[in-house]
């Protein structure tokens, strides 16, 4: 009689659950995921005029960054461009939790925020300068730009520094192909340039995250 497979199945399910955020193991990723779920559901089912006003107010365009930079930076990271079904949302859940397990919640939040801020400023400051120089119209100061993708790319970059070499370089190769494809298409120029900048921010965090390393105390 063949041996029962239930224990193996249970072990597989347990391993799968460990990759997801949880309030005990990864409180930052878990709480942030719930927050993004709430804002995504509201974006889908809330009053359209109110949703539009909130998204406009959360946009990290030059107009908002020049008048209220800090609130705008944080507000823009409360929404997922494309909603909860976006590929960014799916990858976000696993990547953020994986990094938090290795370096703790506060450090993970710092990596995410650093990538979000640096890539945003690196793409918006040239827009402002181009408008001042007369190379772009003033309408370029007002755009709808929000989401978690810059922070996510920085998190991916930092996480790869803690992976085994095979997984590290395979992941970076796949991400590089996707980023080059975006640069060639140039559907969203600022996002296309911002994503590799954010990834480089994450790669620059390798020395810091490696000093902490897997198994470090949370915080």
Q: Where are each of the predicted segments found?
A:
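N-terminal TM1-TM2 helical hairpin plus the immediately adjacent luminal interfacial "cap"
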Residues: 44-98, 105
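Loop-to-transmembrane alpha-helix initiation sites
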Residues: 187-202
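Membrane-interface micro-motifs in multi-pass membrane enzymes
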Residues: 139-159, 194
């Amino acid at each position: 009689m063949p041996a029962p497979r239930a224990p193996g199945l249970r072990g597989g399910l347990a391993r799968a659950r460990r990759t997801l955020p949880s309030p005990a193991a990864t409180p930052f990723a878990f709480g942030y995921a719930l927050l993004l779920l709430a804002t995504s559901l509201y974006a889908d089912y809330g009053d359209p005029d109110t949703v539009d006003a909130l998204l406009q107010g959360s946009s990290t365009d030059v107009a908002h960054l020049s008048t209220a930079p800090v609130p705008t930076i944080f507000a823009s990271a409360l929404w997922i461009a494309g909603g909860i079904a976006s590929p960014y949302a799916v990858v976000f859940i696993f990547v953020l939790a994986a990094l938090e397990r290795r370096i703790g919640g506060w450090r993970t939040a710092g990596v995410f925020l650093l990538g979000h801020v640096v890539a945003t400023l690196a793409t918006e400051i040239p827009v402002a300068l181009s408008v001042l120089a007369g190379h772009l119209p003033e309408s370029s100061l007002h755009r709808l730009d929000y989401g978690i993708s810059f922070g996510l790319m920085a998190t991916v970059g930092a996480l790869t520094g803690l992976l085994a070499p095979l997984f590290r370089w395979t992941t970076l190769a796949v991400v590089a192909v996707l980023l080059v494809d975006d640069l060639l298409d140039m559907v969203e120029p600022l996002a296309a340039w911002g994503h590799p900048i954010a990834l480089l921010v994450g790669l620059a965090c390798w020395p810091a995250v490696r000093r902490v390393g897997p198994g470090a105390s949370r915080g």
